[in-house]
Swiss-Prot record:
Record's keyword terms, sorted: DNA-binding, Nucleus, Transcription, Transcription regulation, Two-component regulatory system
Protein name: Putative two-component response regulator-like APRR4
Organism of this sequence: Arabidopsis thaliana (Mouse-ear cress)
Family as reported in the entry's similarity comment: Belongs to the ARR-like family.
Domain Response regulatory: 43-158
Biased composition (Polar residues): 179-191
Gene Ontology MF terms: DNA binding; DNA-binding transcription factor activity
SUPFAM superfamilies documented for this protein: CheY-like, Homeodomain-like
Transmembrane segments: none
Function as written in the Swiss-Prot or TrEMBL entry: Transcriptional activator that binds specifically to the DNA sequence 5'-[AG]GATT-3'.
GO biological process, one term: phosphorelay signal transduction system
InterPro entries (alphabetical): ARR-like (IPR045279), CheY-like_superfamily (IPR011006), Homeodomain-like_sf (IPR009057), Myb_dom_plants (IPR006447), Sig_transdc_resp-reg_receiver (IPR001789)
Lineage summary: Eukaryota, Viridiplantae, Streptophyta, Embryophyta, Tracheophyta
Name of the gene this protein is made from: APRR4
Chief subcellular location: nucleus
Length: 292
């Protein structure tokens, strides 16, 4: 019997090509996602430098009826994440340390991606887990990965769908409210004005609105992404400790932190990530105590 040629297997299974981006996954269509056999058909990109372990991951994921594309070249994986995100529902990326191209990529644009990225690593240190999670990873799995952890990776897509649906709904409600308020205010302020006067005021208001929007856009463009360095994160933890878990809500945390360049939304997002990291660490401790 001839020895198994890993290179040939990888060349013929889940090849990354510059073709069709695959079926579009509408992340706002939350209920339609569950109308079929979801999570069967979940599209997963898996990168690992170890061809043997890559095939093990593929085999386990396929048992759960996931559509798996495997890759053992980091450049191909990065190219796909940048240019063909719509071909996948989530990505599982193996890393050796919290450095290099993958870390920079995730730190720079990971928060802007609709694609949940799960980190795979042999490093079980809390420091590594925290660094990746704070910088945009959806989850952190330690090798060797248990099949039951692979079975539920779809939860990260569900979370992403809920977030997108919440954002879209909020923006729609805000727009509808602003339109209703604008019409109501105009009617109350100008019930008896002549048609000419009303038209003139409408033109002035329209110019003011455009000027305000231009300033808002310019201000938004100048906003920088908040980097949660050790000092800022410690300030956050001190605020949570001061308030206590029962009272540690984003607005109160922000008041205690007294940092003018972060928003309530920034704090809310970081609070969610921090609790997620805590749950992962507890899971790791239970897992390794059980198997030790």
């Amino acid at each position: 019997m001839q020895p198994l040629n890993m290179a040939e297997i990888l060349d013929h299974r889940g090849v990354l090509t510059d073709g069709d981006d695959g079926p579009f996954r509408n992340l706002t269509n939350f209920y339609d996602m569950f109308s079929s056999n979801f999570p069967e058909g979940l599209r997963v990109l898996v990168f690992d430098e170890d061809p043997s372990y890559l095939l093990i991951l593929e085999r386990h994921l396929q048992k759960f009826q996931y559509q798996v594309t495997i890759c053992n070249e980091v450049n191909k994986a990065m190219h796909t994440l940048r240019n063909h995100r719509n071909r996948f529902d989530l990505a599982m990326i193996q890393v050796n340390n919290a450095e290099g191209d993958i870390f920079r990529f995730l730190s720079e644009i990971g928060s802007e991606m609709d694609l949940p990225i799960i980190i795979i690593s042999e490093d079980d240190s809390v420091k590594s887990v925290k660094k990746w999670m704070i910088n945009g990873a959806a989850d952190y799995l330690i090798k060797p990965i248990r099949p039951e952890d692979l079975r539920i990776v779809f939860k990260h897509l569900v979370k992403k769908m809920r977030e997108r649906r919440s954002v879209v709904t909020g923006e729609a409600e805000k727009a509808a409210g602003e339109k209703s308020s604008s019409v109501g205010d105009s009617t109350i302020r100008n019930p008896n004005k002549s048609k000419r006067s009303s038209c003139l005021e409408a033109e002035v208001n329209e110019e003011d609105r455009h000027d305000h929007n231009d300033r808002a856009c310019a201000s938004s463009a100048k906003k920088r992404r908040v980097v949660w360095d050790e000092e800022l994160h410690q300030n956050f933890l001190n605020a949570v400790d001061f308030l206590g878990l029962e009272r540690a809500v984003p607005k109160k945390i922000l008041d205690v932190m007294k940092v003018d360049y972060i928003s309530r939304e920034n704090v809310a997002s970081h609070l969610q990530v921090t609790f997620l990291i805590y749950n992962i660490i507890v899971h790791f401790q239970q897992h390794f105590c059980f198997y030790s």
